């Protein structure tokens, strides 16, 4: 009795202690009739379910809610029509058989209608239509087992009220054996637990549960006959729960059979609650990617843009001044961690500044040439360097200034350009022995030529070295040595051919003519070789001539 805590007032049905064999024959006759009607009813409902499933597969996600509403209306109408026909036949057949328990059934519909009044108007109409028929039907003898964890499972008010009323339609039958009862109940509620999880995702599953409850009217009447009632019927909530569980079991069996035969199975997903988390996770991953990209772009901009680094350095200086004045009281550990990034940025900034100064210096050297260079030294600003100590900074500045001064001195020297090619010629390339011999021979010839040129440049012309004068002196000397008529004849000829007689020997015009005549005479008359006389002979000849 602990399982059925919701049973009202703990009423007990004393018919539980009666014999079970009285109702077995009735159960068999009812089960045969129920099976015949149930087969036809199942086929019609299966076709409707297939059509609904095809419609669900074709329609878009935006039209699902409309289709759910339409299917609810269709299922309710079909359920009302089938229940009216079914209940009228069952009530007329079983009316004379069970007159003793009609009074008990009259109390049940009143209980089931009381919670249904709180639901929609549709549930009220269903209660009114099924009221007269339920008065003639028996009550199931046994209350079904309630599985834990499914007590609070409700789809909406309409379904709970409909399922509660459908549960009263089930016929009472005998109980064949305890073994069959245990097997059926265990299978029944194991399927119900699995199907309840799969059918909780959408409203279409709840509609199918309504149809499944109609399909289960006959089979459940046979199975309920196996149970012997020991307690009075439960409250409407429990009846709705049990009816829903049994309909879910029958629905799961029908869907399994259809999924094997049909290709287009459009049953809802078993875990719909996890689907909204997927786009949220995707959006989170996309946001993380965007953040990573932004961080990469920021890091690139920090290390590539020198102007941004300058601005950062100014901000750091202002922050440091605030710290000195006592505005910032951060702990030393956090300041040290922040200084690591600042030092790297400051180092890059100072390196770029030094390179810029060197480039400016070299550009000025190329433009101005040998002129004096006046380098604009950077103004010394008292600053705090985060990468080096003050002593190291001063040492680096001194070294940079020294290097700049040396470069400026080398540029100011006038003979700087002439010394550079001399260094290149001072170290000739290494040659083979044959090339060396040729080079030495060439150098020797050049030396001899230079000496001969110097000697020729040093020679000065002598006085009286003309050709005509030399010939005259020569002939005189010969005449003095060998006085003969030939010599006189030569003299006469010379005097005859000379146009200017008695002219001075020093005249240039007579000397030119005498040269030509002397050559012709000497060539024809005598074959003497004309050679220049040494100066001593000339002097002697001149003296002799003067003496004469």
Swiss-Prot record:
- PTM-bearing positions, type Phosphoserine: 8, 19, 160-161, 235, 259
- The name under which this protein is listed is Cilia- and flagella-associated protein 97
Keywords tagged on the record: Coiled coil, Phosphoprotein
> Looking at the record, which segments are called Disordered?
85-297, 407-431, 497-548
> What species is given as this protein's source?
Rattus norvegicus (Rat)
**Could you tell me where the Polar residues compositional bias lies?**
214-237, 264-289, 504-514, 537-548
* Chain coiled-coil ranges: 383-460
Species classification: Eukaryota, Metazoa, Chordata, Craniata, Vertebrata
Compositional bias of kind Basic and acidic residues: 91-107
Q: Where is the composition biased (Basic residues)?
A: 238-248
What residues bear Phosphothreonine in this entry?
155
Q: What family does the Swiss-Prot or TrEMBL record give for this protein?
A: Belongs to the CFAP97 family.
Q: Where is the composition biased (Low complexity)?
A: 112-121, 191-209
Reply yes or no: does the keyword Phosphoprotein apply.
Answer: yes
Q: Where is the composition biased (Acidic residues)?
A: 152-161
Alphabetized InterPro entries for the sequence: Cfap97/Hemingway (IPR038791), Hmw/CFAP97 (IPR029488)
Superkingdom of origin: Eukaryota
């Amino acid at each position: 009795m602990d399982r059925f805590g919701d049973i009202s007032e703990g009423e007990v049905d004393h018919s539980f202690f009666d014999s079970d064999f009285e109702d077995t024959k009735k159960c068999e006759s009812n089960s045969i009739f129920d099976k015949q009607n149930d087969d036809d009813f199942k086929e019609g409902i299966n076709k409707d379910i297939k059509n609904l499933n095809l419609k669900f597969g074709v329609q878009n996600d935006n039209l699902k809610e409309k289709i759910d509403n339409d299917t609810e209306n269709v299922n309710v109408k079909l359920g009302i029509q089938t229940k009216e026909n079914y209940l009228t036949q069952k009530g007329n057949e079983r009316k004379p058989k069970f007159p003793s328990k009609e009074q008990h059934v009259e109390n049940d519909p009143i209980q089931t209608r009381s919670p249904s009044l709180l639901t929609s108007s549709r549930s009220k109409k269903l209660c009114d239509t099924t009221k007269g028929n339920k008065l003639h039907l028996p009550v199931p003898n046994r209350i079904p087992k309630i599985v834990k964890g499914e007590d609070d499972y409700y789809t909406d008010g309409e379904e709970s009220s409909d399922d509660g009323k459908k549960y009263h339609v089930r016929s009472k039958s005998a109980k064949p054996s305890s073994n069959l009862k245990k097997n059926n109940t265990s299978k029944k509620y194991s399927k119900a637990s699995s199907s309840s999880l799969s059918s909780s995702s959408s409203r279409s599953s709840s509609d199918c549960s309504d149809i499944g409850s109609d399909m289960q009217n006959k089979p459940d009447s046979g199975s309920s006959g196996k149970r012997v009632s020991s307690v009075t019927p439960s409250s409407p909530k429990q009846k709705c729960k049990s009816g829903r569980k049994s309909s879910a079991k029958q629905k799961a069996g029908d869907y399994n059979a259809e999924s094997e035969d049909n290709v287009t199975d459009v049953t809802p997903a078993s875990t719909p609650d996890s689907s909204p988390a997927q786009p949220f996770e995707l959006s989170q991953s996309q946001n993380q990617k965007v953040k990573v990209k932004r961080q990469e772009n920021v890091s690139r901009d920090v290390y590539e843009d020198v102007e941004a680094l300058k601005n950062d350095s100014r901000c750091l200086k202002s922050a440091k001044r605030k710290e000195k004045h006592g505005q910032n009281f951060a702990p030393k550990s956090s300041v040290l961690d922040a200084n690591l990034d600042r030092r790297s940025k400051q180092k890059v900034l100072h390196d770029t500044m030094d390179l810029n100064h060197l480039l400016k210096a070299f550009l000025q050297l190329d433009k101005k040439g040998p002129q004096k260079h006046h380098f604009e030294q950077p103004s010394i600003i008292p600053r705090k360097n985060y990468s080096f100590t003050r002593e190291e900074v001063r040492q680096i500045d001194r070294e940079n200034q020294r290097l700049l001064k040396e470069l400026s001195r080398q540029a100011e020297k006038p003979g700087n350009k002439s010394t550079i090619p001399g260094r290149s010629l001072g170290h000739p390339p290494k040659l083979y022995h044959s090339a060396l011999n040729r080079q030495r021979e060439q150098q020797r010839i050049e030396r001899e030529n230079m000496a001969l040129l110097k000697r020729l440049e040093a020679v000065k012309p002598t006085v009286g070295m003309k050709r005509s004068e030399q010939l005259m002196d020569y002939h005189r000397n010969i005449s003095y040595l060998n006085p003969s008529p030939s010599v006189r004849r030569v003299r006469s000829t010379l005097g005859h051919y000379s146009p200017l007689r008695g002219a001075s020997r020093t005249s240039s015009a007579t000397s030119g003519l005498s040269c030509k005549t002397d050559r012709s005479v000497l060539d024809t008359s005598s074959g003497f070789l004309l050679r220049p006389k040494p100066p001593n002979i000339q002097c002697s000849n001149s003296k002799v001539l003067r003496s004469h």
